[in-house]
Amino acid sequence: MTYADKIFKQNIQNILDNGVFSENARPKYKDGQTANSKYVTGSFVTYDLQKGEFPITTLRPIPIKSAIKELMWIYQDQTSELAILEEKYGVKYWGEWGIGDGTIGQRYGATVKKYNIIGKLLDGLAKNPWNRRNIINLWQYEDFEETEGLLPCAFQTMFDVRREQDGQIYLDATLIQRSNDMLVAHHINAMQYVALQMMIAKHFSWKVGKFFYFVNNLHIYDNQFEQANELVKRTASDKEPRLVLNVPDGTNFFDIKPEDFELVDYEPVKPQLKFDLAI
Protein backbone atom coordinates (compact mmCIF):
# COMPACT_ATOMS: atom_id res chain seq x y z
CA MET A 1 0.00 0.00 0.00
CA THR A 2 1.37 3.41 -0.93
CA TYR A 3 1.65 6.30 1.49
CA ALA A 4 -1.15 8.08 -0.40
CA ASP A 5 -3.43 5.03 -0.14
CA LYS A 6 -2.79 4.83 3.61
CA ILE A 7 -3.65 8.52 4.07
CA PHE A 8 -6.73 8.17 1.84
CA LYS A 9 -8.13 5.30 3.90
CA GLN A 10 -7.33 7.05 7.17
CA ASN A 11 -9.09 10.23 6.03
CA ILE A 12 -12.18 8.36 4.87
CA GLN A 13 -12.42 6.40 8.11
CA ASN A 14 -11.86 9.53 10.18
CA ILE A 15 -14.71 11.34 8.42
CA LEU A 16 -17.04 8.34 8.75
CA ASP A 17 -16.20 7.83 12.45
CA ASN A 18 -15.63 11.36 13.72
CA GLY A 19 -17.14 13.72 11.18
CA VAL A 20 -20.17 15.94 11.75
CA PHE A 21 -22.94 16.82 9.31
CA SER A 22 -23.20 20.17 7.56
CA GLU A 23 -26.28 22.35 7.90
CA ASN A 24 -27.75 24.77 5.34
CA ALA A 25 -25.25 23.66 2.71
CA ARG A 26 -24.92 25.73 -0.47
CA PRO A 27 -24.31 22.91 -3.05
CA LYS A 28 -27.16 21.08 -4.76
CA TYR A 29 -27.40 17.76 -6.53
CA LYS A 30 -28.74 17.70 -10.08
CA ASP A 31 -32.21 16.84 -8.79
CA GLY A 32 -32.25 20.05 -6.75
CA GLN A 33 -31.79 18.39 -3.37
CA THR A 34 -29.42 20.03 -0.88
CA ALA A 35 -26.01 18.35 -0.91
CA ASN A 36 -25.07 18.07 2.74
CA SER A 37 -21.87 16.36 3.79
CA LYS A 38 -20.10 14.76 6.70
CA TYR A 39 -16.85 16.57 7.41
CA VAL A 40 -13.80 17.11 9.57
CA THR A 41 -11.75 20.27 9.82
CA GLY A 42 -8.02 20.93 9.77
CA SER A 43 -6.68 18.08 7.62
CA PHE A 44 -2.93 18.25 6.95
CA VAL A 45 -0.48 15.87 5.30
CA THR A 46 3.10 16.05 4.03
CA TYR A 47 4.24 14.24 0.88
CA ASP A 48 8.00 13.93 0.38
CA LEU A 49 8.22 13.94 -3.40
CA GLN A 50 11.99 13.37 -3.15
CA LYS A 51 11.18 9.93 -1.74
CA GLY A 52 8.51 9.17 -4.34
CA GLU A 53 5.53 9.98 -2.11
CA PHE A 54 3.02 11.31 -4.64
CA PRO A 55 -0.54 12.21 -3.54
CA ILE A 56 -2.38 9.84 -5.84
CA THR A 57 -4.44 6.88 -4.69
CA THR A 58 -4.48 3.52 -6.44
CA LEU A 59 -7.84 2.61 -4.87
CA ARG A 60 -9.75 4.01 -7.86
CA PRO A 61 -8.81 5.55 -11.23
CA ILE A 62 -8.05 9.28 -11.02
CA PRO A 63 -8.05 11.44 -14.23
CA ILE A 64 -4.65 13.03 -13.65
CA LYS A 65 -4.06 14.10 -17.26
CA SER A 66 -7.38 16.00 -17.33
CA ALA A 67 -6.47 17.57 -14.00
CA ILE A 68 -3.15 18.81 -15.40
CA LYS A 69 -4.92 20.25 -18.45
CA GLU A 70 -7.25 22.15 -16.13
CA LEU A 71 -4.24 23.47 -14.24
CA MET A 72 -2.69 24.77 -17.46
CA TRP A 73 -5.97 26.43 -18.41
CA ILE A 74 -5.75 28.34 -15.14
CA TYR A 75 -2.04 29.18 -14.93
CA GLN A 76 -0.86 29.21 -18.56
CA ASP A 77 -3.92 30.31 -20.55
CA GLN A 78 -5.01 32.42 -17.59
CA THR A 79 -8.67 32.50 -18.53
CA SER A 80 -12.04 31.40 -17.22
CA GLU A 81 -13.48 30.85 -20.72
CA LEU A 82 -15.02 27.41 -20.93
CA ALA A 83 -14.55 27.16 -24.71
CA ILE A 84 -10.77 27.19 -24.29
CA LEU A 85 -10.88 24.45 -21.66
CA GLU A 86 -13.26 22.35 -23.73
CA GLU A 87 -11.85 22.89 -27.23
CA LYS A 88 -8.13 23.13 -26.51
CA TYR A 89 -7.96 20.48 -23.80
CA GLY A 90 -11.13 18.40 -24.20
CA VAL A 91 -12.09 18.94 -20.56
CA LYS A 92 -15.83 19.50 -20.21
CA TYR A 93 -16.80 19.01 -16.56
CA TRP A 94 -16.43 22.69 -15.61
CA GLY A 95 -19.54 23.51 -17.64
CA GLU A 96 -21.66 22.77 -14.59
CA TRP A 97 -20.20 25.89 -12.93
CA GLY A 98 -20.66 28.24 -15.89
CA ILE A 99 -22.46 31.52 -15.17
CA GLY A 100 -24.20 31.84 -18.55
CA ASP A 101 -21.68 33.97 -20.44
CA GLY A 102 -19.33 31.19 -21.50
CA THR A 103 -17.13 31.57 -18.42
CA ILE A 104 -16.99 30.56 -14.76
CA GLY A 105 -16.85 34.24 -13.84
CA GLN A 106 -13.95 36.37 -12.64
CA ARG A 107 -12.35 33.35 -11.02
CA TYR A 108 -9.27 31.13 -11.20
CA GLY A 109 -7.48 31.84 -14.51
CA ALA A 110 -9.15 35.22 -14.94
CA THR A 111 -7.87 36.18 -11.49
CA VAL A 112 -4.38 34.91 -12.35
CA LYS A 113 -4.34 37.15 -15.44
CA LYS A 114 -5.86 40.22 -13.79
CA TYR A 115 -3.20 40.36 -11.09
CA ASN A 116 -0.34 38.87 -13.17
CA ILE A 117 0.02 36.27 -10.44
CA ILE A 118 2.29 33.82 -12.26
CA GLY A 119 4.43 36.58 -13.73
CA LYS A 120 4.96 38.10 -10.29
CA LEU A 121 5.64 34.69 -8.72
CA LEU A 122 8.28 33.71 -11.28
CA ASP A 123 9.85 37.16 -11.09
CA GLY A 124 9.95 37.00 -7.30
CA LEU A 125 11.51 33.53 -7.28
CA ALA A 126 14.09 34.64 -9.84
CA LYS A 127 15.08 37.71 -7.80
CA ASN A 128 15.20 35.99 -4.42
CA PRO A 129 14.05 32.37 -4.09
CA TRP A 130 14.69 32.52 -0.32
CA ASN A 131 12.14 35.31 0.08
CA ARG A 132 9.27 34.08 2.26
CA ARG A 133 6.72 36.01 0.17
CA ASN A 134 6.48 33.80 -2.91
CA ILE A 135 2.74 33.20 -2.79
CA ILE A 136 -0.20 32.57 -5.12
CA ASN A 137 -3.52 33.81 -3.72
CA LEU A 138 -6.76 33.44 -5.69
CA TRP A 139 -8.95 34.71 -2.83
CA GLN A 140 -9.73 38.18 -4.18
CA TYR A 141 -12.89 39.83 -2.81
CA GLU A 142 -12.91 42.40 -5.60
CA ASP A 143 -13.30 39.58 -8.11
CA PHE A 144 -16.07 37.94 -6.09
CA GLU A 145 -18.03 41.20 -6.16
CA GLU A 146 -17.43 41.66 -9.90
CA THR A 147 -19.25 38.51 -11.08
CA GLU A 148 -21.03 35.42 -9.87
CA GLY A 149 -19.17 32.13 -9.84
CA LEU A 150 -17.84 29.33 -7.66
CA LEU A 151 -15.35 30.66 -5.14
CA PRO A 152 -11.89 29.07 -5.39
CA CYS A 153 -11.50 25.85 -3.41
CA ALA A 154 -7.72 25.53 -3.71
CA PHE A 155 -6.95 29.20 -3.26
CA GLN A 156 -3.46 29.72 -1.86
CA THR A 157 -0.08 28.19 -2.61
CA MET A 158 3.22 29.13 -0.97
CA PHE A 159 6.66 28.24 -2.28
CA ASP A 160 9.94 27.86 -0.41
CA VAL A 161 13.39 26.68 -1.43
CA ARG A 162 16.13 24.95 0.54
CA ARG A 163 19.65 23.91 -0.38
CA GLU A 164 20.38 20.37 0.73
CA GLN A 165 23.73 18.78 1.56
CA ASP A 166 24.05 17.62 -2.04
CA GLY A 167 24.25 21.28 -3.06
CA GLN A 168 20.97 21.14 -4.99
CA ILE A 169 18.11 23.58 -4.50
CA TYR A 170 14.77 21.92 -3.72
CA LEU A 171 11.40 23.62 -4.19
CA ASP A 172 8.72 22.94 -1.56
CA ALA A 173 5.07 23.90 -1.99
CA THR A 174 2.21 24.36 0.47
CA LEU A 175 -1.36 24.17 -0.85
CA ILE A 176 -4.17 25.62 1.26
CA GLN A 177 -7.69 24.60 0.34
CA ARG A 178 -10.87 25.85 1.99
CA SER A 179 -13.05 22.88 0.97
CA ASN A 180 -12.45 19.47 -0.57
CA ASP A 181 -14.62 16.56 -1.74
CA MET A 182 -12.51 13.73 -0.30
CA LEU A 183 -13.63 10.94 -2.61
CA VAL A 184 -13.84 12.82 -5.91
CA ALA A 185 -11.43 15.75 -5.88
CA HIS A 186 -8.81 15.19 -3.18
CA HIS A 187 -6.12 13.60 -5.33
CA ILE A 188 -7.07 15.64 -8.39
CA ASN A 189 -6.39 18.91 -6.57
CA ALA A 190 -3.25 17.62 -4.88
CA MET A 191 -1.71 16.29 -8.08
CA GLN A 192 -2.58 19.49 -9.95
CA TYR A 193 -0.50 21.51 -7.56
CA VAL A 194 2.29 18.95 -7.51
CA ALA A 195 2.36 19.40 -11.30
CA LEU A 196 2.51 23.18 -10.82
CA GLN A 197 5.35 22.72 -8.34
CA MET A 198 7.20 20.56 -10.88
CA MET A 199 6.71 23.11 -13.66
CA ILE A 200 8.14 25.92 -11.54
CA ALA A 201 11.05 23.75 -10.40
CA LYS A 202 11.90 22.90 -14.02
CA HIS A 203 11.70 26.58 -14.99
CA PHE A 204 14.50 27.32 -12.51
CA SER A 205 16.42 24.02 -12.88
CA TRP A 206 15.62 23.07 -9.28
CA LYS A 207 14.64 19.74 -7.77
CA VAL A 208 11.16 19.03 -6.45
CA GLY A 209 11.06 18.73 -2.67
CA LYS A 210 8.10 18.37 -0.32
CA PHE A 211 4.40 19.03 -0.90
CA PHE A 212 2.37 20.17 2.12
CA TYR A 213 -1.41 19.91 1.81
CA PHE A 214 -3.85 21.61 4.20
CA VAL A 215 -7.63 21.30 3.77
CA ASN A 216 -9.86 23.32 6.08
CA ASN A 217 -13.09 21.36 5.45
CA LEU A 218 -12.58 17.79 4.23
CA HIS A 219 -15.88 16.10 3.48
CA ILE A 220 -17.82 13.17 2.09
CA TYR A 221 -21.23 14.01 0.62
CA ASP A 222 -24.28 12.30 2.04
CA ASN A 223 -24.83 10.29 -1.16
CA GLN A 224 -21.28 8.86 -1.13
CA PHE A 225 -21.17 6.68 1.98
CA GLU A 226 -21.54 3.44 0.02
CA GLN A 227 -18.59 4.38 -2.18
CA ALA A 228 -16.60 5.45 0.89
CA ASN A 229 -17.03 2.05 2.53
CA GLU A 230 -16.12 0.31 -0.72
CA LEU A 231 -12.87 2.29 -0.96
CA VAL A 232 -11.90 1.45 2.62
CA LYS A 233 -12.37 -2.26 1.87
CA ARG A 234 -10.39 -2.29 -1.37
CA THR A 235 -6.89 -3.74 -1.55
CA ALA A 236 -4.50 -1.17 -2.98
CA SER A 237 -2.26 -1.81 -5.96
CA ASP A 238 1.28 -2.95 -5.17
CA LYS A 239 2.64 -0.33 -7.58
CA GLU A 240 4.14 2.99 -6.48
CA PRO A 241 2.87 5.55 -9.04
CA ARG A 242 4.81 8.72 -9.70
CA LEU A 243 4.51 11.74 -11.94
CA VAL A 244 7.42 12.60 -14.24
CA LEU A 245 7.93 15.84 -16.16
CA ASN A 246 9.91 14.99 -19.29
CA VAL A 247 11.44 18.34 -20.21
CA PRO A 248 15.00 19.63 -19.75
CA ASP A 249 15.92 21.74 -16.74
CA GLY A 250 15.44 25.41 -17.54
CA THR A 251 12.38 24.86 -19.76
CA ASN A 252 10.22 27.97 -19.67
CA PHE A 253 7.09 27.57 -17.55
CA PHE A 254 4.83 28.56 -20.45
CA ASP A 255 6.43 26.10 -22.88
CA ILE A 256 5.50 23.03 -20.84
CA LYS A 257 2.61 21.01 -22.31
CA PRO A 258 0.24 18.42 -20.82
CA GLU A 259 1.87 15.66 -22.86
CA ASP A 260 5.22 16.42 -21.21
CA PHE A 261 3.87 14.78 -18.05
CA GLU A 262 4.04 11.02 -17.68
CA LEU A 263 2.29 9.00 -15.00
CA VAL A 264 4.50 5.99 -14.31
CA ASP A 265 3.48 2.69 -12.69
CA TYR A 266 -0.12 3.78 -12.25
CA GLU A 267 -2.33 0.69 -12.13
CA PRO A 268 -5.41 1.70 -10.11
CA VAL A 269 -7.97 -0.72 -8.76
CA LYS A 270 -11.10 -1.13 -10.89
CA PRO A 271 -14.00 -0.87 -11.49
CA GLN A 272 -14.38 2.88 -11.32
CA LEU A 273 -16.98 4.17 -8.87
CA LYS A 274 -19.80 6.53 -9.86
CA PHE A 275 -20.43 9.80 -8.06
CA ASP A 276 -23.23 12.36 -8.43
CA LEU A 277 -21.52 15.72 -8.18
CA ALA A 278 -22.66 18.50 -5.90
CA ILE A 279 -22.86 21.80 -7.82
Curated annotation (Swiss-Prot):
Q: Which PROSITE patterns match?
A: THYMIDYLATE_SYNTHASE
Name the Gene Ontology biological process terms. Answer: dTMP biosynthetic process; dTTP biosynthetic process; methylation
Q: Where does dUMP bind?
A: 132-133, 178-181, 189, 219-221
**Residues that bind (6R)-5,10-methylene-5,6,7,8-tetrahydrofolate:** 181, 278
Question: What job does this protein perform?
Answer: Catalyzes the reductive methylation of 2'-deoxyuridine-5'-monophosphate (dUMP) to 2'-deoxythymidine-5'-monophosphate (dTMP) while utilizing 5,10-methylenetetrahydrofolate (mTHF) as the methyl donor and reductant in the reaction, yielding dihydrofolate (DHF) as a by-product. This enzymatic reaction provides an intracellular de novo source of dTMP, an essential precursor for DNA biosynthesis.
Q: What is the scientific name of the source organism?
A: Lactococcus lactis subsp. lactis (strain IL1403)
Q: Which GO terms describe its cellular component?
A: cytosol
Q: What Pfam families does the record tag this protein with? A: Thymidylat_synt
Concerning its family, UniProt says:
Belongs to the thymidylate synthase family. Bacterial-type ThyA subfamily.
Major enzyme class: transferase
Q: Would the keyword Cytoplasm be found if you checked this record's keyword annotation?
A: yes
Q: Where in the cell is it found?
A: Cytoplasm
The record's keywords, sorted A to Z, are:
Cytoplasm, Methyltransferase, Nucleotide biosynthesis, Transferase
- Active-site positions on this chain: 153
Q: CDD domains from the xrefs?
A: TS_Pyrimidine_HMase
Q: Known InterPro entries for this protein?
A: Thymidate_synth/dCMP_Mease, Thymidate_synth/dCMP_Mease_dom, Thymidate_synth/dCMP_Mease_sf, Thymidylate_synthase, Thymidylate_synthase_AS
Q: What is this protein called?
A: Thymidylate synthase
Assembly notes? Homodimer.
Q: What is its EC number?
A: 2.1.1.45
List the catalysed reactions. Answer: dUMP + (6R)-5,10-methylene-5,6,7,8-tetrahydrofolate = 7,8-dihydrofolate + dTMP
